[in-house]
Amino acid sequence: MSSDASTYRLEDVLSSFYRVEKIKKINYHQYISKAQNDQWSIQMEFMLRKQDPKTLVALLSRDLWCFSINDDPVPTPPAIEHKPVSPDKIGTFTADYSKPNLPPHYALFLKALRRKIYINLALGSHNKLIQFGNACISLSGVPNYLVQLEPHLFVNGDLTVSLCAKNMGLVPMKEENLEESFLSKHALYLAPSGIRMHLAPASKQGYLITPPKHTELLLTTLSVSHGINLQNKKNLKWVAVVPDLGHLNGHTPTIASYLTPLLEAKKLVWPLHLIFAQPVADIENSTSGDPSEFHCLQDALDAIDDFIQLKQTAAYRTPGSSGVLSSNIAGTNPLSSDGAYTEQFQHYKNNSISSQPASYHSVQETNKISPKDFSPNFTGIDKLMLSPSDQFAPAFLNTPNNNINENELFNDRKQTTVSNDLENSPLKTELEANGRSLEKVNNSVSKTGSVDTLHNKEGTLEQREQNENLPSDKSDSMVDKELFGEDEDEDLFGDSNKSNSTNESNKSISDEITEDMFEMSDEEENNNNKSINKNNKEMHTDLGKDIPFFPSSEKPNIRTMSGTTKRLNGKRKYLDIPIDEMTLPTSPLYMDPGAPLPVETPRDRRKSVFAPLNFNPIIENNVDNKYKSGGKFSFSPLQKEEALNFDISMADLSSSEEEEDEEENGSSDEDLKSLNVRDDMKPSDNISTNTNIHEPQYINYSSIPSLQDSIIKQENFNSVNDANITSNKEGFNSIWKIPQNDIPQTESPLKTVDSSIQPIESNIKMTLEDNNVTSNPSEFTPNMVNSEISNLPKDKSGIPEFTPADPNLSFESSSSLPFLLRHMPLASIPDIFITPTPVVTISEKEQDILDLIAEQVVTDYNILGNLGIPKIAYRGVKDCQEGLITTTMLQLFSTFDRLNGNDTISKFYNMKQPYVFVKKHHELIKVKHDSQPFIKFLNFRPPNGIKNFKSLLLSSSFKEDCLSFAPTLSQTYINQELGFCELLKLTNEDPPGLMYLKAFDKNKLLLLAAQIVSYCSNNKNSIKNVPPILIILPLDNATLTELVDKANIFQVIKNEVCAKMPNIELYLKVIPMDFIRNVLVTVDQYVNVAISIYNMLPPKSVKFTHIAHTLPEKVNFRTMQQQQMQQQQQQQQQQQNNSTGSSSIIYYDSYIHLAYSRSVDKEWVFAALSDSYGQGSMTKTWYVGNSRGKFDDACNQIWNIALNLASKKFGKICLILTRLNGILPDDELMNWRRLSGRNIHLAVVCVDDNSKISFIDEDKLYPSFKPIYKDTRFGGRMDMTRLYDYEIRDIDQDIHGIVFQHPFPLAHSQHRCAIRSGALIKFKKCDGDTVWDKFAVNLLNCPHSDSTQLLETILEEFRNLAALNVWYGLSDGEDGHIPWHILAVKKMMNTLVHTRVKIANTSAATVHTATSSSIILSDK
C-alpha cells in the first residue's frame, strides 16, 4: 500500500467549517446598569431583538454588550426619557486574541453570534427548527436530529461556523403520549432551554390544564427571545411541569437513576409543543447475545434434519383420514391426533413433546429467557416437580391467540361450516387442564436458596414503540439526506422527497402474518401465483387484516399463563403435526392391525418442501406456533438490531463544566438576578432544605455558576488592554495563570443567587403586552419604560407562583423566565440511559468491586459487545448547498463557503508503525504491531515470562458445553506458552476445572469458598506459593446487569476465602455463555481470551508485550554557533512569555501518560496510566458521588500514582495529562495546578474521538487500497516467485497524523481554545466519500517554546500507544487510532455510569428505593 502522504489531495477533503465573514475588527459597547436596576439589561436586549432579530447582543451579569463586525454600526439601546444611552466602555478586538483562556469579550461575541443564528433559523423555518439547549432541534421529520452550529474565529481572520448533527432519539411530546406507560420510559426536557423536567398530573383525569393567565406574555417572550412563534398556533395544549432545579444549576441528575421522579413540588405551566422526550434504552429486551439465529452448528444441522425428516415422512400420509371430524376414527386411528403413535413415530412424538427450538423466541414473551431456562442439562426444582403431561403444555403457551375457528385451518374455505361443538378435541381439553395445573405449580414453586433476580416485565408492544423511538444507526449519507437536502426536510434544507408510502406498505409485510398464508390450497396458490407476482405490493398491503401478528387478548380461545415464558426442555422437532392431518381427508384409513403401513397413492408431488408458499400444511389452531411466526428461520419484526454504539458526552456542569453554558448563554446567576424569580424558585445552596429535596443527587448542590466568578471576571473588562492582545498571542503556560480570585475556593464553585433580585414581572408584562396590542409591537416608548421602572413592586418575593383561586395552578410568568433565558449544553444531557440498572454495594474504604467490573469491560476483546449499550455519535454534514440553513446564513452574513482541507490542515503525514517485543525460539525479537492476528502461526511468546494459575469454571447451566470449554481454554493457554493452567478439582465427584451449581445462593457459595480454602491449605504444604486462582463465570446474557450479578457472586467467594487465607489471590473472568456454547468459535478467539487472562494475572503491570524502543534515525550535534543562536532565541521567547518561565529545551528523557475523565453527573472518576512503551500500565475507578472532598481525594490518588511511576524514570520527565471529551473544567484544573511541581513538566491535553468537527474524504486514489475497493481489477496479481517482496499490512492499523493550521476551541469548554490542534486519523475501508475516523488532540499548554514540535511528539506517543489496543485486549482492531489508556477510560466510563452504587453501613446511601435486578447478597 502506498504510504506517500504527499500524493494526498487536501483540497478533496471537506471540513465541517463554513466561512461566513472576513474579520478585520470586532466592535463592542458595554452598558452597565444604572441605579442598581437588575432588569434594565434584559429589557434592553428584548427591545433590540424586537427591533432587529439580527442584532448581536449578549448579557453578562447586569451588563449589556452590543457587537458589530468590521465597519457595521454597533446597535444602540433605545433612549430613556428622550435621553440617549451612552456606553460605559467602547473597544475593538481582532482575531489575534490570547489563548488558551479566551478573553471575555470574545466569549460573549460567540454567544451573541450563536443566538443570532438560532433565532433567525427559528423564524425562517416557521418553528421547524427551534433552539434546544445550545443546539437546535429539527421537527420536520423522524428522527428529530439535533443540529449544532458553533462559531469560531480563526487567527487569520476567518469567521467560521462548524456544522454537525446528532440523533439522541428526542421526540416531541404529543397528547396521546400523556400516559404512564410512555412517561415511565422517557426522560422529558423543556425547550428551548433543554432543562430536565417531569410532568405533574393536573388531576386524576390527565395532565392537560387550562392556559395560564400570562399565556400571551409567555408566547410573546418566546417569539422575541428565540424566534418561536406559537401565538397563532391553534389548539395549543398546556401542561404543568416540575423542572429539575438541580439541572438548572448545572447538576446533571444521576444517570443510573435518571428516570427517578423528583421530590420537588415547584411547578410551572409550559406548552406541550415545547416538551421533548428521550427514550430509555431497554438493554434486557433489545439485546441478543449472539446475532446469529443459531447458537451453534448443531442447531443449524438440526433444523436441516427437521426438514429432511418432514419430507421423508410425507410418504406415510394416507388420504381419507381425519382426527377431527370423525370421533370413531379419532378414537381408533393410531395416526390420529388422539391415538397412539406406532413404533416408527414414537421418537418423533417424544421429541416434539419434550423439546422446543432453543433459538426460537415467542412474540408473546415478556421476560428475558436465560440459557438455563431451556438447558437440557438443567435439572432445577421447576422441572423436577412437573409431570410429563405438565411439560407438554408449555410448548403451546406461547402460541398466538387467534380468534378463528380451529377447524377452519383443516378445511377448504368453502367447507368451513363445522359446528363449534366439534372443536372440543381431547388435545384441547388436555391443554386447558395442563395449563391450569402448570399455572398452579409455577405459582407455588420457587427456587429456594437462590438469589432473587427481578425480570423485566414489559410488553412487546411497548417495546416496539420504544425501539421505534430509539436512535437508529444510519449511515452518514442517510443522515445528510434527511438533514440537508432530501427526504422530508423540504422546507428545512431545500430538496424534496417522495412519499414514503412504499415503506409503510412494506412494513406491514413484516408486521403482520395472516391465515391467508396457510389456508391457501394448491389450486388457489397456482392460480394466484401470477397475480401475486404482478401485484405484490397490493397483496402485501392486504395482509394482516384477518389475523394480526399480535393477537387480541380480549377473547382468548384457550387458557394461557401470563408471564410464563420458560422453556422447560430443549429442542422441539418440526414433526409435531399428526401425519394423517397434513392432507385433506378423502377416504378412511385402512385399519388392519397386521397389515404393513399404508403407502401414499402416487400423485403429483409438490415442487419443493422448502418453498414457503408451496408448502402449506394444514395446521390445527394453537398446536404449533412456529409456522404462524414464519418458521424457525424467521425474524420477529419486533427484534430490531441496534447499533452497539455509545459515546456519552462527559461535560462537567456543577462547578466548571457550566462554563460552556455560561459562554453560550450568559445566563449565570448574574443573569438570573435580572429575572423576577421568587425566593423559593431561586437556585440556591440550600436547595435541599428549601425545596424538600432529600435525594442524594442534590447533596452539596450550589447555585448557578457565574462567569464573573470563574473565567470572566468583571475586573477583566476594565483592565483589558487591546494593545496587549497582539503581544500575547500564545500564552503557552497561561492555562496556569488564572488569577486566584478567578477560581472559586468554596466547597462548590457555584455562587448563590443574590437575594436582592428585584421583580421584573410587571415591567416585562406591561412592556410586552402593550406592544402586543399595538399595531407596531416593535416600538417601545421611553415613557413606558420609565414608568414601568418606577413602579416596580417592592416585595422581593414577587408575585405568588400559584393563584389560590385557580384550581389548575395557574403560574406567573416570573417562574418561567429562568427557563427561557437558560440554555443547557448538550454535554449536560446523557446520550444514553438504560434500564434496568444494576446495584453494586461498596463501603467507604473498599471499592475493589468497581475495579473488578471495570477490568472485565476493558479487556474483553469486544466479546461482550459493549454490553448492549448503544453509541451516539456526532455526524458530519456532507452537503449543505441548499435549504433553510444556507438561505438563513446568506441572509445574515456575506458568504457561506465551505473550508477544504488545504484551508485548515498545515501538515498531513503517514505515521510509522511501531514495533513490539516478542519471544520466538527463546530469543527476544521486534515485530510490527499489526502482526497480532498471526500469533498462533508465528509462535510468538510473551517476552516477560510465563504466568501460571489454576482455573475453575462455575456454571448453573449447559454443563456439557462448559465441560468441553474448560479443558480447551486450558490447553490453548498452555500451547501458546503463556504459562501453565491447572484445572482445579475440589471434590472427587466434580470434573476438573468445572463446578456445576443449580443456583448461586449464598450458602452454596460459602461452601464453595470453604472447599477452596481447604484445597489451598492442603496444597500449601507441598508448594511454597499457591498460584492465583481464576474463577470463570459465564454470562447468561451479555448485559451490565448480568455482569454485576456475577461480580457480586465472585465478591462473596473472594471475601470468604481471603478472610481465612489472606495470601490467596482470586481473580475473575466473565465469558458469555454464547461464546462457550458456540462450536464455531475460532482458535484465534480462544487465543485472544487466553492472552486477556495473561494480561489480568499478577503482576498486572506486566502485559503480553510492550512497545520496542527505536533508535533515532539521525543525531543532531550542537556547535558553539548553534548554541549561541539558540540562546538568543530563548531570550526572545523569554521576553515574549516573561510570565510563563518557558524553556526552549524541548527534549525529554521520559514521557508519562495519564488519562482521566469524569462522568456527566460528576459521580464517577476514571483514570488510566502508562509510560511511552505501555509498561507500568494500570486502570482505576472511583465513585465520588456528590462529595467534593472525595473528588479531591481521587485527584490526590491519581497524582500519587503518576508520581510513583515517575520515580522509576530518569532524566527530564514530561507528564502528558489527558482529559477526555474535549473539556477541562476549572475545578479539575485547580487540582492539577495545586498538585503540579518542578520535578515534572506538565503538558495538558484535551482529546475527543467524537468531536463536532468532521472531515469528509473525497479523494479517490490515496491510500492505494481505495481503487481496489472500487474495482478489484485495479489490484495486481500476486507473483508467487516474489513472495519475499510483499508486505502484509493491516489497513485498520494504518494511521496518519494531522497538524491543523489554526487551533480549535474545546468542544465543551468553548471559553478555552487550544494553542495547537492536531489529530490521528484512519481511512475507512472503502473507495472514499466517507468521514474520517478522527481522534482530536488539543494542546492547552506547552512547557517550552515550540508547541508545534511538542504536539507532533504527543501525536507520535499516542500513535504508539494505540498500537497496543489489540495486544491488551481493548478492541479487535476497530479503534486502531485511539491510544489504549484513553480507550480504557472511555470503555469504563460508558459502562459504569449506568450502575447504581449503594454505600454499606452509611445512612446517606446513594441508591434509590427502586427495585433492582441485581443480586444483593446479605446475611440473614
UniProtKB/Swiss-Prot annotation:
The modification Phosphoserine is found at residues 370, 375, 425, 608, 636, 748. Keywords: Activator, Nucleus, Phosphoprotein, Repressor, Transcription, Transcription regulation. The keyword Glycoprotein does not apply. Residues 655-669 have a biased composition (Acidic residues). Residues 429-439, 454-484, 670-683 have a biased composition (Basic and acidic residues). Residues 416-511, 653-691 are annotated as: Disordered. One of its GO terms (molecular function) is cyclin binding. Phosphorylated. PKA-dependent phosphorylation at 'Ser-608' is enhanced by activation of the RAS signaling pathway. GO terms for biological process: negative regulation of transcription by RNA polymerase II; positive regulation of transcription by RNA polymerase II. Residues 416-427, 440-453 have a biased composition (Polar residues). The modification Phosphothreonine is found at residue 601. Pfam families: Med13_C, Med13_N. Its main location: nucleus. InterPro entries: Med13_C, Mediator_complx_sub13, Mediator_Med13_N. It is found in: Nucleus. It comes from the Eukaryota. PANTHER family: MEDIATOR OF RNA POLYMERASE II TRANSCRIPTION SUBUNIT 13. Belongs to the Mediator complex subunit 13 family. Component of the SRB8-11 complex which consists of SRB8, SSN2/SRB9, SSN3/SRB10 and SSN8/SRB11. The SRB8-11 complex associates with the Mediator complex. The SSN3/SRB10 and SSN8/SRB11 kinase-cyclin pair also associate with the RNA polymerase II holoenzyme. Component of the SRB8-11 complex. The SRB8-11 complex is a regulatory module of the Mediator complex which is itself involved in regulation of basal and activated RNA polymerase II-dependent transcription. The SRB8-11 complex may be involved in the transcriptional repression of a subset of genes regulated by Mediator. It may inhibit the association of the Mediator complex with RNA polymerase II to form the holoenzyme complex. The SRB8-11 complex phosphorylates the C-terminal domain (CTD) of the largest subunit of RNA polymerase II RPB1 at serines 2 and 5. This is Mediator of RNA polymerase II transcription subunit 13.
